[in-house]
Amino acid sequence: MLKSALGDLILRPWFDRAALKILTTWYFPLSRAWAEAVAAEGSAERFFAALPARRRSDRLVPRILTLVQRRCEALKAAEEAWLHAFFGPGPAQIDVEAERLSRAAQLMGLRSLFAPLHLEHPFPAVAWRVEDKASVERRHSERLREPARAFVQRNGPEAIEPSRGFINGDGVDGWLRFPSPVPAIGPQAWARVGTPLPEARRRLDPQPTLVFAHGIGMEPEYWGYQREPITGLLQSGIRVILPELPWHGRRRMAHSYGGEPILALGVGGLLDFFHAAVLEIGLLVAWARATRGGPVAVGGVSLGALTAQLVATVARHWPEEMRPDALFLVAPSQALEAVAFEGSLSCGLGVPGALQAAGWTLEETTRWRPLLNPVGDPVMSPDQVVVLLGVADDVTLAEGGEALVAAWRVPPANVFRCDAGHFSTSLALSRDGAPLERLLSLLSALG
């Protein structure tokens, strides 16, 4: 559909305004109720302790919680079978993965059941628990004093355990798991790997890899894995690694929906998230290089782009094998503090007000820039950086993306702009393959 004439109508700023409204007034609030329903484990008393009671709650909530609990149990059983198939004795079959995805999507889709209650008495979009300045200082000040040691890699690629794989369309799909480098995030990190089939693999030798990170709240491992434009690179012989970012999917924090702690915990949550995500991507780069030997690009969309751009500068302090060779950014921004205080999604969810209520000002947030924003030039040449910007992006802010491109002196041939807002910019990849073709040409030349 996006490649048809209808795509010209959809991929416009009006779409982004509508998407923003749906996210802030419906998706995030319903996700808030859903998260507490999952945590309640069927108990109405526990659910009501977390969220205020409503007139219709006594009738609807017990029935909803019963269904949520059944779906949770079904997903747990499917995930146990999945672990046995792909990380245990097997056999690794596509039907096992299809069952896991189906059960996960069925549970995720129960958000809609809370719509009648939300209409009666709106749920909050975020359960705020912003960490105070003294606590953040205590936990992260040493990292701020020594930027060169702020993202120290303590594990090597040997810590990564690959799963069995299965043929899925144009490639062989599998997963990676390894210990999370930051205890505050949780014990386990995950990534999905798509490897080209032998015929496509022979087109590029040694084989390049792209490590591509998703945006906030995007949980393809739970909503349903789709062959998005990025994974189309498999046909060209490029392996694709899709990390499951901290606090998303399998890594979701109890009483939270996917990505919520990044917002709810304030500056402390951002520092923990980027600390873990950056180290994890660096480790995936090293694993990719050790297993195929070809050039490795890192990239991402929105929050994933903010993570990848930080990897690109932090990697100066890492061993050679952990340094990416190229960068692919969709909707990035130079200043995260501006995104938090001025971005339309942040403002629509109440981030600035929550930070200010906890005593955080823009100036105090700016102090932590060296741990949140790219400082200095990327580890790779500007010629190896490809950027896609939406000229009407008011979420990660178009001017922030332009500032990054200018500061890094990215060649004009590597910068692509579309007349779109934040959400439609990423969708534009399905319509215009030029940015990915440019990345492919760079990786081919590097190989």
Regions found by a protein language model. Give the residues of each.
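N-terminal targeting or regulatory segments adjacent to alpha/beta-hydrolase or S9 domains
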Residues: 1-175
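Short, surface-exposed "cap/lid" segments of acyl-processing enzymes
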Residues: 183-258
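Alpha/beta-hydrolase active-site loop
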Residues: 254-291
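Gly/Ala-rich beta-loop-alpha elbow adjacent to hydrolase catalytic centers
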Residues: 299-308
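Hydrolase active-site cap/lid region
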Residues: 310-360
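Acidic catalytic loop of the alpha/beta-hydrolase fold
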Residues: 336-337, 352, 391-397, 422-423
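Short beta-strand/loop motif that positions the catalytic acidic residue
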Residues: 380-382, 386-389, 393
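C-terminal catalytic histidine-bearing segment of alpha/beta-hydrolase fold enzymes
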Residues: 402-447
